[in-house]
Curated annotation (Swiss-Prot):
One family name in Pfam for this protein: TRAPPC13_M
One term under GO cellular component: TRAPPIII protein complex
Disulfide bond sites: none
Family: Belongs to the TRAPPC13 family.
Protein's name in the database: Trafficking protein particle complex subunit 13
Length: 412
């Protein structure tokens, strides 16, 4: 913390101290064998030390608390607390004392004073005390500006300021990845790394979705008594430089799921709300900005699967259900064609009319196929033609099925 001292001697003295949690006292135990030259000297010294734990003198952590010896670090999301004291060091009464505390950041100036009214008088050896609090929401350089104005007994008005500069650091490194599913679901993977020098207790990591989505947290596992437990265990500590991954599933709300054009254009997913605790329960909170994803491009016509079996029998027909959605802003007149591949064959009439499909409307079509080759086979060969514009849309590698032989050949 940098302090610019006032050049002129004043009747009042200003002191500013940061309020932080104390820390547990640590010592470095020194031991030796009984047959060594010091004998039991080190053990007796540790037992006489008031800072050690009785019965566990070799434990590094002691029972006593120590106050911080320096300004320490301030991290984004924590609460900055400071004690401000104005003391009358003179032998005369000072009048109309006004103490003002402002916090200057890179983007704004905030008034942190609890009261903006002046104190009528301050007698010798008396003081004015104030405690300020501020939740830090910006990183970078912060300057605490403390200004004091007063009037002497002779009626002279005096004024002085002190500046306290400190840096706000970033506590967490948050990285996100999006995965778009064919069912309009969006999976969010959030990687959170502790980039401080002390462990954190992760109290809450939640996703606040946008108005179009419902969210499901995938960070719990079901236990036997119908309750769920966190995948990270009961004591959710994040050590320095450790990274933890959180997973969320977002589903469109029913009123928006039917509007293909609306879901297609959505880029805002929501924001992460992270709450943690550090030394002796000191809390910090961080909210990310609105998370955005690259909206998937489906073109004018989207083809998705509503039903498909995982495993089918060799040379036995099986059914699938396709959903065709008009993602354009015009009405389409669609024609469906089915092209066979080497291993998968379509059953039915190719080149049939599907009729007109309005913008954002959907149509479900049941289809039948047959596979002539075993193994994992890809379903391809669907063609949709818009007869209005004479434009054809090709769909290959729509899905995969596992083809097995239902017959068991006798052993030779």
């Amino acid at each position: 913390m940098d302090v610019n001292q006032a050049k002129q001697e004043h009747l009042l003295a200003l002191k500013v101290m940061r309020l932080t949690k104390p820390t547990l006292f640590t010592n470095m135990p020194v031991t030796c064998e009984d047959r060594d030259l010091p004998g039991d000297l080190f053990l007796r010294l540790m037992k006489d030390d008031p800072s050690t734990v009785k019965g566990a003198e070799t434990l590094i952590l002691g029972e006593m608390l120590t106050l911080p010896q320096n300004f320490g670090n301030i991290f984004l999301g924590e609460t900055f607390s400071s004690y401000i004291s104005v003391h009358n060091d003179s032998s005369q009464v000072v009048k109309d004392i006004l103490v003002k505390a402002d916090l200057q950041t890179s983007s704004q100036r905030l008034n942190l004073s609890a009261s903006n009214s002046a104190v009528s008088e301050l007698k010798p050896e008396c003081c004015i005390d104030d405690v300020i609090h501020h939740e830090v929401k910006e990183i970078g350089t912060h300057i605490l500006v403390c200004a004091v104005s007063y009037t002497t007994q002779t009626g002279e008005k005096l004024y002085f300021r002190k500046f306290f500069k400190f840096q706000v650091l970033k506590p967490l490194d948050v990285k996100t990845k999006f995965y778009n599913a064919e069912t309009d679901e969006v999976f969010l993977e959030a990687q959170i790394q502790n980039i401080t020098t002390s462990p954190m207790f992760m109290e809450k990591v939640s996703l606040e979705p946008s108005m179009m989505y419902n969210v499901t947290e995938l960070n719990n596992v079901a236990s036997g008594d119908e309750s769920s437990e966190s995948t990270f265990g009961k004591m959710s500590y994040l050590q320095p430089l450790d990274t933890r991954q959180y997973l969320y599933c977002l589903k469109p709300k029913p009123e928006f799921a039917e509007k293909a054009g609306v879901i297609k254009g959505v880029t805002v997913i929501g924001k992460l709300d992270i709450v943690w605790k550090t030394n002796l329960g000191e809390r910090g909170r961080l909210q990310t900005s609105q998370l955005q994803r690259m909206a998937p491009g489906y073109g004018d016509v989207r083809l998705s699967l509503e039903f498909i079996p995982d495993t089918v029998d060799l040379e036995e027909p099986f059914d699938i259900t396709c959903k065709i959605t008009n993602c354009s802003e015009r009405t389409m007149d669609l024609l469906l064609e089915m092209c066979n591949t080497r291993s998968v064959h379509w059953c039915g009439v190719s080149g049939r009319q599907l009729g007109k499909l309005s913008p954002s409307a959907s149509l479900s079509i049941p289809l039948k196929l047959l596979s002539s080759v075993q193994g994992l086979q890809s379903i391809s060969g669907l063609r949709l033609t818009d007869t209005f514009l004479k434009r054809t849309y090709e769909y290959d590698d729509i899905a995969q099925v596992c083809v097995v032989c239902p017959y068991t050949s006798p052993e030779s």
